[in-house]
C-alpha cells in the first residue's frame, strides 16, 4: 500500500511539474536610424508584417503597425519614445522586436524594446489579430531607460533611472492576453 501511495505521489508531482510554461524567444529584429528618419517594412512571419517609422534627433520616436494577410485588422502603436544615444555628433535610435512563444499554450507575443521605459510594449498575436498586451507607459512613475529579459519561467522589465534599477516581473493572464507588472 505504501509503495502505491509513493508511486501515486511521484506521478502527481511529475505531471504537475510538466505543465509549467517556458518562454522561448526567436531571433530579434533590430532596426536603427542615424540622425534622421527612416521607414522599415519587415516580415515577422510568412503572413505577418511590421511597418516602422523611426526618427532620431533631439528625441527618438517610433510608429509601428502590425498587420496580417489573413485579416484587415491592424495594431498601431504611435509616437513611442525611443532612446537616442549621441556618439561622434550623431543621434542614433534603435528599436528591437523580439518574438516570444509560451510553450505551454503556443501563445505568441512580440517584445517591443525602444530603450525608453515609456516605449516598452508587448504585443500579442492570436487568431490572426494583434493586440496590445502590455505598455510600460501605463505603470505609475516609470521613466528612464528600460530593457526586457526573458528567463525560462518569467519575463522581466528592467527600468533604470538616475542609477537606480527597478525590476518588474510580468505575469500573463491567458484569458485576456495581457501582462501585469509587479515590482
Q: What spans do the regions from the language model cover?
A:
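Long, charged/polar, surface-exposed segments that mediate recognition or autoinhibition
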Residues: 96-135
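Sec-dependent N-terminal signal peptides
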Residues: 6-11
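Beta-propeller domains
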Residues: 63-74
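Positively charged n-region of N-terminal signal peptides that target proteins for export
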Residues: 1-4
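Surface-exposed loop and turn segments in beta-propeller and other repeat-based domains
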Residues: 73-90
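Acidic, small-residue rich beta-repeat scaffolds with periodic aromatic anchors
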Residues: 21-39, 44, 54-59, 125-183
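Entry beta-strands of beta-propeller and related beta-repeat scaffolds
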Residues: 49, 105-110, 152-156
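N-terminal signal peptide c-region/cleavage motif recognized by signal peptidases
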Residues: 16-18
Amino acid at each position: 500500500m505504501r509503495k502505491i501511495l509513493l508511486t501515486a505521489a511521484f506521478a502527481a508531482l511529475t505531471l504537475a511539474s510538466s505543465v509549467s510554461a517556458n518562454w522561448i524567444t526567436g531571433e530579434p529584429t533590430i532596426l536603427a536610424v542615424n540622425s534622421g528618419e527612416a521607414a522599415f517594412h519587415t516580415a515577422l512571419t510568412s503572413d505577418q508584417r511590421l511597418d516602422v517609422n523611426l526618427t532620431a534627433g533631439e528625441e527618438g520616436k517610433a510608429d509601428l503597425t502590425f498587420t496580417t494577410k489573413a485579416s484587415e485588422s491592424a495594431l498601431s502603436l504611435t509616437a513611442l519614445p525611443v532612446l537616442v544615444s549621441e556618439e561622434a555628433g550623431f543621434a542614433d535610435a534603435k528599436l528591437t522586436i523580439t518574438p516570444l512563444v509560451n510553450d505551454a499554450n503556443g501563445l505568441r507575443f512580440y517584445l517591443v524594446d525602444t530603450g525608453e521605459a515609456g516605449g516598452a510594449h508587448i504585443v500579442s498575436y492570436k487568431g490572426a489579430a494583434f493586440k496590445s498586451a502590455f505598455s510600460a507607459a501605463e505603470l505609475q512613475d516609470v521613466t528612464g531607460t528600460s530593457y526586457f529579459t526573458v528567463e525560462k519561467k518569467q519575463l522581466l522589465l528592467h527600468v533604470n533611472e538616475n542609477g537606480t534599477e527597478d525590476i518588474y516581473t510580468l505575469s500573463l493572464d491567458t484569458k485576456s492576453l495581457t501582462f501585469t507588472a509587479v515590482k
